[in-house]
């Protein structure tokens, strides 16, 4: 089976206690272990060891990013984790931007060293799904993955490939934790079962 690293981006802040992301991390941990996978979990808002986190990325076949949507993207603690770990991973997670002075025609973003690995986003948002998918709504129909394009590209810069994104919507205005956990279990079984 696979080695799966879960980055838990939950954070207590303002009106959010991070409980839903903690719950979904627990759901993923239990479901994936039941399916026979090895799982490691790190909390982005912790005193992680940067060198150990690079080794976690090398160990993992799949990285799951569990996080809330804050101000149209990842929480700053998740971005800090990426900045710390990906930068430390120069030479092991990526070699360069893919181009050289001798051959600048090579494609930018092709210097990743972890080809064959995959990543998945698991997101929680107060916005309803139609805010992402309908052209006359807030995100003008670009979809969830369109909103997360820079986040996807950061992972793809390392050479990783995306798995289908999971999102729990309307988590503050219309919370339904039993539905979210059941839908997430189903999503995980479809991908990793």
Curated annotation (Swiss-Prot):
Residues binding FAD, per UniProt: 16-23, 69-72, 108, 124-127
SUPFAM superfamilies recorded: Flavoproteins
Keyword Iron on entry: no
A GO-annotated cellular component: cytoplasm
Record's subcellular location: Cytoplasm
EC number, UniProt record: 1.6.5.10
Pfam families reported in the protein's UniProt record: Flavodoxin_2 (PF02525)
InterPro entries assigned to the protein according to its UniProt record, in alphabetical order: Flavodoxin_fold (IPR003680), Flavoprotein-like_sf (IPR029039), NADPH-QR_MdaB (IPR052397)
Keyword Transcription regulation: no
Enzyme class: oxidoreductase
Reaction catalysis annotation: a quinone + NADPH + H(+) = a quinol + NADP(+)
Record key words, sorted: Cytoplasm, FAD, Flavoprotein, Oxidoreductase
GO molecular function terms listed in the Swiss-Prot or TrEMBL record: NADPH dehydrogenase (quinone) activity
PANTHER family assigned: NADPH:QUINONE OXIDOREDUCTASE MDAB, PTHR46305
Subunit: Homodimer.
Known function: NADPH-specific quinone reductase.
Annotated family: Belongs to the oxidoreductase MdaB family.
Protein known as: NADPH:quinone oxidoreductase MdaB
Gene this protein is translated from: mdaB
């Amino acid at each position: 089976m696979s080695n799966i690293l879960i980055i838990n981006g939950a954070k207590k802040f303002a009106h959010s206690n991070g409980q839903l992301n903690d719950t979904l991390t627990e759901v993923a941990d239990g479901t994936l272990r039941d399916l026979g996978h090895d799982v490691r979990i790190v909390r982005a808002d912790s005193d992680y060891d940067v060198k150990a986190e690079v080794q976690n990325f090398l160990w993992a076949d799949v990285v799951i990013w569990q996080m809330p949507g804050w101000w149209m993207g990842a929480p700053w603690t998740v971005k800090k984790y990426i900045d710390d770990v990906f930068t430390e991973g120069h030479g092991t997670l990526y070699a360069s931007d893919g181009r050289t002075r001798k051959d600048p025609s090579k494609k930018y973003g092709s210097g990743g060293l972890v080809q064959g690995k995959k990543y998945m986003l698991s997101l929680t948002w107060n916005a309803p799904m139609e805010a992402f998918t309908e052209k006359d709504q807030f995100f003008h129909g670009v979809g969830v993955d369109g909103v997360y394009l820079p986040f996807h590209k950061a992972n793809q810069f390392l050479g990783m490939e995306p798995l289908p994104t999971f999102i729990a919507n309307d988590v503050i205005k219309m919370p339904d934790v039993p539905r979210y956990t059941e839908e997430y279990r189903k999503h995980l079984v479809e991908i990793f079962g």
